[in-house]
């Protein structure tokens, strides 16, 4: 999943401003509408997926738990799209060895339902790490990582 935005290493992260915990919700999407199949789409208020992210003392990215997936999603941080994209972003920021995070993923929509569950989880994870770091990145800078996770 290489995105490699080397310009992100120029971003200054204020380690004193890093939060201990954040929670982000990302809604389901509908993109298969009549003649606008995969062209027209919209987000809905519910359902959606939720990510809780915690700063921990040991560096690295780990999955603490996944709820609502029926045991189908990997807890291995290298094989889960949420944690893999967070890890990639931290590498590109040049701080992957300086920070540790644990992720709780709460799935509120069925996997394979066509509601954009994997996209919602990935976006929530990336917005969560950005919020944890004090929001140093713009939405445009986060976008390549969101696309990579999808």
Which residues are covered by each model-predicted region?
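Alpha/beta catalytic cores of group-transfer enzymes, especially the acyltransferase/condensing modules
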Residues: 137-150
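ATP-binding N-lobe of GHMP and related small-molecule kinases
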Residues: 2-113, 131, 135
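Short acidic-hydrophobic sequence patches enriched in Asp/Glu that either
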Residues: 78-81, 121, 138-141
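DPxDG-like acidic metal-binding loop motif
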Residues: 115-138
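Generic structural marker for isolated residues within well-ordered, non-membrane alpha-helices
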Residues: 86, 126, 143
């Amino acid at each position: 999943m290489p995105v490699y935005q080397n310009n992100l290493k120029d971003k200054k992260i204020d380690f004193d401003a890093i939060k201990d915990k954040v929670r982000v919700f990302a809604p389901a999407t509908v993109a298969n509408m009549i003649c606008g199949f995969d062209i027209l789409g919209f987000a809905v208020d519910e359902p959606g997926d939720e990510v809780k992210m915690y700063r921990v003392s040991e560096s690295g990215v780990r999955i603490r738990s996944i709820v609502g997936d029926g045991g189908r999603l990997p807890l291995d941080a290298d094989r889960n799209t949420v944690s893999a994209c967070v890890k990639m972003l931290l590498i590109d920021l040049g701080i992957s060895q300086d920070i540790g995070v644990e992720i709780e993923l709460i799935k509120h929509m069925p996997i394979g339902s066509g509601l954009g569950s994997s996209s919602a989880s990935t976006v929530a994870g990336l917005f969560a790490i950005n919020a944890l770091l004090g929001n140093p990145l713009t939405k445009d800078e986060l976008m390549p990582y969101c696309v990579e996770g999808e």
